[in-house]
Design a protein with these regions (language model features):
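Bacterial N-terminal signal peptides
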Residues: 7-18
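Positively charged n-region of N-terminal signal peptides that target proteins for export
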Residues: 1-7
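Exported/periplasmic ABC-transporter solute-binding proteins
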Residues: 22-89, 93-250
């Protein structure tokens, strides 16, 4: 058996023990906004199993970087871009991070609307140019990549005029479902929401996966409990939830 799986199982077993239950922790968790659906389902399961309590805070990359250096926390499940910031990385314990999940990009339309062609770079370009309006979250790691794709397609300036910027991932699908924007352009798991349908993923030449990593904070008040939650995110139960939410585990 894989040694990492054995270690994860042992850590989780300790967290589930009567001794651990008697010393239940309250963990402050910082997480990428695009992990909201997955962690809101997995969090209560972990709490029920271990007795620990999770205080989940979801935010985009710029806000997460600020949060890591402004207040105590116990662990993060964050876009890897957060770890590229030296000040933010220094707030996490030394040692390897774990790859929790990854997700690609796509385009969504309102449910029932005709799905445009996004299968090739040129098709995606023409679809974006023809759209009356688009929406995404510019101030995020995922949004930064969307902007790069616009520039690669040579339509960066054209997109500025028709973009309706959102401040949280969940608002993207809501705007499309309400008819406030014709297209949603973002991570595919965020676009899997009521009232919207995925027109398709970005074509292979433009596709990239945003990786979410997990790590315990250097100042965690209960590092073993924090590590137990990260280990829980690698279990078959968690893997099943991630897949159901449109996220690729690991």
């Amino acid at each position: 058996m894989d040694k990492s799986l054995v270690a994860a199982a042992l850590s989780l077993a300790i967290a589930m023990s009567p001794i651990a239950a008697a010393t239940a922790a309250e963990l402050k968790v910082l997480a990428g906004g695009s992990m909201t659906a997955s962690l809101k389902e997995l969090g209560p399961r972990f709490e029920k199993t271990t007795g620990h309590k999770l205080d989940l805070t979801f935010a985009a990359t710029p806000e997460l970087i600020k949060m890591t250096t402004s207040a105590p926390f116990d662990l993060g499940v964050v876009p890897v871009d957060v770890m590229k910031n030296d000040a933010a990385r220094a707030t996490f314990a030394a040692g390897p991070m774990i790859n929790v999940a990854r997700v690609g990009y796509g385009v969504a339309v309102r449910s029932g609307a005709q799905k445009p062609d996004v299968s090739t770079p040129d098709a995606l370009k023409q679809t974006l140019l023809k759209a009356q309006s688009i929406t995404f979250l510019p101030e995020s790691a995922a949004g930064a990549y969307v902007l790069k794709v616009f520039d690669r397609l040579g339509i960066g300036d054209a997109m500025k005029a028709k973009t309706k910027a959102q401040t949280a991932p969940g608002e993207i699908a809501k705007a499309v479902a309400a008819g406030d924007a014709e297209l949603g352009v973002f991570l595919t798991n965020v676009l899997m929401a009521p009232g919207v349908e995925l027109a398709g993923p970005f074509p292979g030449e433009l596709q990239q996966e945003l990786v979410f990593v997990g790590a315990v904070a250097a100042g965690s008040k209960d590092a073993p409990a924090a590590k137990a939650f990260l280990d829980f995110l690698t279990t078959p139960e968690a893997v099943g939830v991630f897949k159901a939410k449109g996220v690729t585990p690991g």
